Amino acid sequence: MPVDDCWLYFPASRGRTFVQTVWVAPTCPNCCWFPGFLPPVPRPPHVPRVLLRGPRGAVLPASRPSKTLPSSSQTPCPTDPCICPPPSTPDSRQEKNTQSELPNKKGQLQKLPTMNGSKDPPGSYDFDLIIIGGGSGGLAAAKEAAKFDKKVLVLDFVTPTPLGTRWGLGGTCVNVGCIPKKLMHQAALLGQALKDSRNYGWKVEDTVKHDWEKMTESVQSHIGSLNWGYRVALREKKVVYENAYGRFIGPHRIVATNNKGKEKIYSAERFLIATGERPRYLGIPGDKEYCISSDDLFSLPYCPGKTLVVGASYVALECAGFLAGIGLDVTVMVRSILLRGFDQDMANKIGEHMEEHGIKFIRQFVPTKIEQIEAGTPGRLRVTAQSTNSEETIEGEFNTVLLAVGRDSCTRTIGLETVGVKINEKTGKIPVTDEEQTNVPYIYAIGDILEGKLELTPVAIQAGRLLAQRLYGGSNVKCDYDNVPTTVFTPLEYGCCGLSEEKAVEKFGEENIEVYHSFFWPLEWTVPSRDNNKCYAKIICNLKDDERVVGFHVLGPNAGEVTQGFAAALKCGLTKQQLDSTIGIHPVCAEIFTTLSVTKRSGGDILQSGCUG
């Protein structure tokens, strides 16, 4: 009689072979040889020689054997003498791996271990793939896996913020990240454009008011359409979606709990963790009671008024930028440096530009207490803060306090310890291989929760798609985490790709890099006569490698649009000579990169007198 379906590994096959039915053939007591299929393979202790029947009844390698194999049909081992080691005796087996260590009795079926220690054969799972997290990466992986006719389940559940904010399918980027942030950044740019328009002949009233409620209504309407579109796309691709919280309860098993507390248990051959991150709180009196995070800001039903932004991350500076851009009084409280992890030359220029445009900075202070002075929408709050390098304390009153001090991975409450997935105990990040595989072979992870990887939506999408193609499409293409472009949507946008100046010095040595740089003045800004010599371009070249460009940085309008094309060039090995030989498009901001000639080392003048230098 056949045993359960399982996976069996044969070293000589350079891969894995699916065993749908296993038949005992006790001819050679020492090896797993069967005619015409593989060379002799040493047999693990107490695992009998087998003949295999593949999927849909296909016999490996010849015709399907009968359930009782007569001795005349048994083929002796082709090696003479047999090269396989004798099996261990029952007394020598150890306590662990009990599924594979039953006594070997000739002519009797033995229980073989299935992949990853599960008692379930792959064919008996509810799904081929269960994805925990319905963000950009998880959805990309789900839709890609469905192309290969795999049965996929997506579990997505939003734990409400302390203020009760929640949202629909799509994850951080769509609901409380990239999409609403960029739209509100656009609202601020339009405010500046209205001011500039007077110099272009438009008659605009001196007082132009911004309507917060109208903006959030429009933004949330667009987000709602995206949420619906994702659900429709999953349904069309026959991906099962449940609004439920997923938690591992054992190997290949998960419990899904919906918002009413109803639980369902599902099993899958593989799992993908794509749970993302949530904003971090300070752990001080009043932070969760009275403060908001970026998870709350984009759907806030009232104008936040005078706002204190706590933090120096890109989230903090982007939010401070568009809030100031729509006319609000904004202060940023910074513990140490701006934009940690980014090029500090560029970060400081961003800070200077924001200060010149009315955003106040309180540096080297951290909040210690938040108190409510007056309830309301927005109400009034008192903030007490402590200096990071002295005993000085300060107080200030604000209508809204926005916390943007970092984000924590959503990995600590999904039962990873139950199945043995290792995480960084300090950060909650998950270490993975270059194929996004955790230390548990059937569990994978992508996105912001990965240790040492970029926390960017396009990275998660790319990793999710490529993972599904490798698992189900026979691909061997891996996600390339090098030279990934990104943009910080501050009032003066910052686009970059490759190494920061600090990282380049660390990697190659200061004497082995050359930095070419220049200020520039967008033509559109010359007529309203604003922000001359504030936009800035910089490339970092490796002198030991034909001046190959290893870092690209730009401050200016539409920085993301400028950076995207250069990112492709960097991946192709762009050199300074190739940039110099490229004819620029005139008059646009990006052409500055075709004319860079002054190096930082030289100390030459980089100020520009007009759009054409």
UniProtKB/Swiss-Prot annotation:
Record location of the Cysteinyl-selenocysteine (Cys-Sec) cross-link: C611-U612
Annotated residues for binding of NADP(+): 280, 312-318, 335-336, 340-342, 406-407, 429, 455
InterPro entries reported for this sequence: FAD/NAD-bd_sf, FAD/NAD-binding_dom, FAD/NAD-linked_Rdtase_dimer_sf, GSHR/TRXR-like, Pyr_nucl-diS_OxRdtase_dimer, Pyr_OxRdtase_I_AS, Thioredoxin/glutathione_Rdtase
GO molecular function, one term: FAD binding
Disulfide bonds: C173-C178
Keyword Ubl conjugation: yes
Keywords of the record: Cytoplasm, Disulfide bond, FAD, Flavoprotein, NADP, Oxidoreductase, Phosphoprotein, Redox-active center, Selenocysteine, Ubl conjugation
Biased composition (Polar residues): 65-74
Recorded superkingdom: Eukaryota
N6-succinyllysine found at: K182
First-tier enzyme category under EC: oxidoreductase
Region called Disordered, residue ranges: 58-121
Catalytic reaction equation(s): [thioredoxin]-dithiol + NADP(+) = [thioredoxin]-disulfide + NADPH + H(+); H2O2 + NADPH + H(+) = NADP(+) + 2 H2O
Cofactor note: Binds 1 FAD per subunit.
Modified residues (Phosphotyrosine): Y245
Post-translational modification: ISGylated.
EC nos: 1.8.1.9, 1.11.1.2
Biological function: Reduces disulfideprotein thioredoxin (Trx) to its dithiol-containing form. Homodimeric flavoprotein involved in the regulation of cellular redox reactions, growth and differentiation. Contains a selenocysteine residue at the C-terminal active site that is essential for catalysis. Also has reductase activity on hydrogen peroxide (H2O2).
Other comments on record: The thioredoxin reductase active site is a redox-active disulfide bond. The selenocysteine residue is also essential for catalytic activity.
Family named by the database record: Belongs to the class-I pyridine nucleotide-disulfide oxidoreductase family.
Entry-linked PANTHER family: GLUTATHIONE REDUCTASE, THIOREDOXIN-DISULFIDE REDUCTASE
Assembly with partners or alone: Homodimer.
Protein name (Swiss-Prot/TrEMBL): Thioredoxin reductase 1, cytoplasmic
Organism: Mus musculus (Mouse)
